[in-house]
Amino acid sequence: MKIKLITVGKLKEKYLKEGIAEYSKRLGRFTKLDMIELPDEKTPDKASQAENEQILKKEADRIMSKIGERDFVIALAIEGKQFPSEEFSQRISDIAVNGYSDITFIIGGSLGLDSCIKKRANLLMSFGQLTLPHQLMKLVLIEQIYRAFMIQQGSPYHK
């Protein structure tokens, strides 16, 4: 199985880079992880709804160009389904059993994701109603993917 993580915006914070590097290394035992950072569009202060929609569309075009036709796509969205870690682990396992070799996770930029990305997604997933920086979500998601594999292995890491 290969996991692809598509994110909008460049990661700048050193502490986040270090955490992501650590969990990426750990994940290497279980899966190939491909991380794709796409540039975000600059959002003007007090942007209109039309400007925001235009920005989301441009970011969506970049995202769509990186999604494989046969990828199982999980998009992070506040309105998505929340899972306990054990259920998330089982979902990842089930996706592989159902014939998907590539899982693509998508984290949008500061404005979120365009509706076309949400429609393409096989699953909308949420980590709750909290608003978190999308750069931080990258670290949280990678840790949860690692945790999912550790749960599948019966490791005490999850305790």
UniProtKB/Swiss-Prot annotation:
It is found in: Cytoplasm. The keyword S-adenosyl-L-methionine applies. Its EC number is 2.1.1.177. GO terms for molecular function: rRNA (pseudouridine-N3-)-methyltransferase activity. Keywords: Cytoplasm, Methyltransferase, rRNA processing, S-adenosyl-L-methionine, Transferase. Its main location: cytoplasm. HAMAP family: 23SrRNA_methyltr_H. Homodimer. This is Ribosomal RNA large subunit methyltransferase H. The gene is rlmH.
